[in-house]
Amino acid sequence: MFMFRNCAVLLVIGSICCFIYGLFRLHVEVEPNACRMTYMFGEPMFAKVGVRDGDQYPNYALYYYYEGLRQPLDPLKRRMTGAPVIFVPGNAGSYKQVRSLASVALRKAMSNDAGIHLDYYTIDYDEELSALYGGYLHRQQSYLKLCIRTILSIYEGRTEQPSIVLIGHSMGGKLAQSVLVDPAIGQHINTIISISTPLDQPVLNLDTQLEEFYDQTDAVLSKLRTATVPTMTTNVCDSLHQRPPSVQRMASQDSSARLDNVLLISTGGGNRDLLVRPGLTSSRFNDLHAMTSAIPKVSLSCDHLSAVWCLQFMQAINRFLFSVAYVREDRSSIAFGTNKQRNLQTALSTFVKPRRRQQNTVRFGAAGNWHEERRLVINKYFTNGLKGTFFDLIGLQRQERYRKAAIEALNVDDEDWLFGCSAEDNNKTGQLYCEKATSLMHLVQWLPNEDREPRSIALLDLHNLRKTYVHWTHLLVRLPPSAKRIGYNLDIYDPKERVTDIKMPRWYTMAKLPLINETLQGTLHHRVRISEMVDPYQSIRVIVEPLQCINPEYRVTARICVPWAAGFERFQTLKSFDQKPQLYVNVPTLVPRHYNTTLNPVTLELYLDPTCRYRISYEYSYSSALSRLVLEFYGWLPAHLVCVLLIVLRKQVETFYDVGTFRSLRPYVGYLQYTSLYIVTACRLLKKLIISSRVFPEPEPLDYSINVSIVIHCAAIALSLLATLGTWLALTLYGNAFYRLALRITRLSQATSNVMISIMTHLPITYGILTIATAMGTCSGVGLLLAFVFYFLMLSNAYKDYLEDFLWQKAANLVRGKPSAVTEQEDATEEQNEEQNALKQNDEQKQQQQEEEEPEACVGLQNFSFHVTLLLMLFVQLLLNAPSSLAWLRSRRHGINLPDPSLYPSIVVLASLSLLLQLRAPQKCQGYWMLSIAFYILAGVVLLYCQAAIYRLTYVIAGAFALLSAHQSLWILWGRVSRV
């Protein structure tokens, strides 16, 4: 038992250190921001647009964006000819965030020969915290519908009513998606682009209003739109460009859902976005998802705020919008095309860069610089560029085992450079050439290379090419004239030598494992397939160490593909010896149930610099895994903290120390524990029983490793200890400071506050009446704040009084128990000896009387450890109500009444707390074993039902307070009845 206790303590300490290190690495070791700033070329101007029936939303507004015009512009009085786009800001977002998008569109319209231009509108939501308080969302959704109707009325003079594009950032993307639940509005929506939006579930589920908003949107869209759900056989790495089910049904003319004609595009910021993690940015109702690190000509990670001003990303979005817009036949206005399949292909070209299926035939003459290559490895560069077109023919007839070819072109932008053809002899020169050739650019993939020379590569199966095109004899590489360095690389190889299968290392695997001891010179491509990578916190560090390079700078591009997560393709780049030669591989979402990762592994494609030789190894990345664990699961911390407090309270409620002992002074009694870890393991088994029995509600579907729960729970234990010690210091040292702060906030005089504290200390029921009335008159958070302040001051005064009595008692005991000075004088009288003997006899008699009397137990406010735990639970309840309190505070100035989702649980907490103080709880009584069982059950409920749905914790805390007050009340009532 002693060994087990020591191991448990070490486990708690180790988990705490892991959590702190993961938190540190998450915020410190972040890749640099490579976004370029978007600058306005004219003064940004916002013209307010009057919204019909918008008077009921006094704090909202609709604006039209324009630049440079000195005179005010009113879209309602002016003929608008552009294609309408609405920008919807998100959590605490400003309507002015549209500037980057709209300014890029204005510049692009000036250089557009077709005359296409866009009209950008933006909504002012008063920078409301819509991600923290769900009561905002229904109001914002209703106002967005009014804005759409108003904008449609501006363009109602057209022969055809235009369709609108919605661009939403953060929670604005969810609002844009939610308007589709109204078919009357949905039929006017052309495309919705969401930027870093938690689409299918919120980042933190903090109240019932937020959960209801997501559930209602999901339920309606399930009926009106075709959903895409990964199955056991899904593998997007084998078919990256498969069409979504909605488009397939439309193309086959099956009975398609009503809203399948709306194109939904979602984007995620990648590793730099610490507010909305990548796994939340996709939706099962989407047609296309892309990470900014994989978008062509963007190829970087954006944090949550830079996603709305990153120039490369803004250009990509506007490039798509201009591609789907067209000028009407009468050239009177601009509109967005309504052919969804065509728009989707354009979106794929912009955000994914798909393989182009159409193959065009190009004719070449015999004139030109023609060459034939038969080598397996070719590295051909022209440092000073080319004055004319250069042709290289690569024979298809190879040995049987050399069936794969990787061909890379450098500094060839968008021109066709790869073809297949049937070569013939030139009668004049005797050289081979191709009269006509078929483009293979649909097999070419563009690779990000930061600001260096563009890379594009094609991976070809020579056997399939020979079978498909029997008459072909050669591949043709055409390099256009260029003043820059240009060239290409060729690597023909046996695919068995370039594919390596590995398993995800276990977390206890400490060693670095070899992958390739040394690559051959000229190696261009290598594929690594990783099985058993199933959890989003798991991470592998792949070390690509250059052993010898011709040039001081090299280039390695890694492409990571997760087979069950469409649109989460990511690229990473290594480019110099100064950079750490490491890549990180992880997955954005949990693997689907019963998914076989051996048949469909995570794929890591390594595109190497052929002028280098490399040593490649891999290991379990503890630093990356811990940072991802914190990022993915920090939302579980409140539930585990409440679980710890319940287990601590279960122990404290039946533990009574004697008055005057040192233990009674320690409010952290019970927090140095590890027994709450038993609840974590027990809930894993209990969850399976609940699911199989189908009697109780189904627990939250959080099928993660138990290691995650242990680390988060140990972090909660540490947090509870820190909170308790902080409360102890505040009670002891800073009680007066908090008292003065409370006086300044409440603006009460010291005499008045002293009277109120005295009344509430001696008659705590008035404390409950005051706080409950405040909660019902304002909001629950204000009542809880008032209760917390008074409870803290009452506890601080009681602790100071008790500490003062304790010190005086100890001092008196020392004085009484101090032996009289033994005089060494020989002339000491017998009277002094008799007096000393009399004093000793009196002290012995008093000591015997004290031993015979039963020691007094610490009850009421003297049981400080119990009340400190109640104070912390009240503080947790206050924090859970903070978003709704902020919403109430902001809405007061506009006279808006918003729902208070936690009012009733807060009233229960306030009433129970006042009753406990009135009864001087806790009292020594019977029945604490039943209360302990109830607290165990509540702790299990927290871990089964409240880790993701954080708002349910308010009901659990209210239940704990109610059980405590009911137990104390029934015992006192039973005692009085039994006396009668």
Swiss-Prot record:
Membrane topology, record value: Multi-pass membrane protein
Glycan attachment sites: N427, N517, N596
InterPro entries: AB_hydrolase_fold (IPR029058), PGAP1-ab_dom-like (IPR012908), PGAP1/BST1 (IPR039529)
Amino acid composition bias (Acidic residues), ranges on this chain: 824-834
Sequence segments annotated as region (Disordered): 821-853
Enzyme class name: hydrolase
UniProt-recorded Gene Ontology molecular function terms: deacylase activity; phosphatidylinositol deacylase activity
Chief location: endoplasmic reticulum
This enzyme's EC code(s): 3.1.-.-
Any GO BP annotation: protein transport
One Pfam family per UniProt: PGAP1
A Gene Ontology term for the protein's cellular component: endoplasmic reticulum
Keywords: Endoplasmic reticulum, Glycoprotein, Hydrolase, Membrane, Protein transport, Transmembrane, Transmembrane helix, Transport
Compartments, record wording: Endoplasmic reticulum membrane
Active site per database record: S170
Intervals, Cytoplasmic compartment: 1-7, 650-709, 796-867, 917-929, 976-980
Residue ranges that the UniProt entry lists as topological domain Lumenal: 29-628, 731-774, 889-895, 951-954
Positions of transmembrane segments: 8-28, 629-649, 710-730, 775-795, 868-888, 896-916, 930-950, 955-975
Function: Involved in inositol deacylation of GPI-anchored proteins.
Family classification: Belongs to the GPI inositol-deacylase family.
Name of protein: GPI inositol-deacylase
Taxonomic source organism: Drosophila melanogaster
Lineage: Eukaryota, Metazoa, Ecdysozoa, Arthropoda, Hexapoda
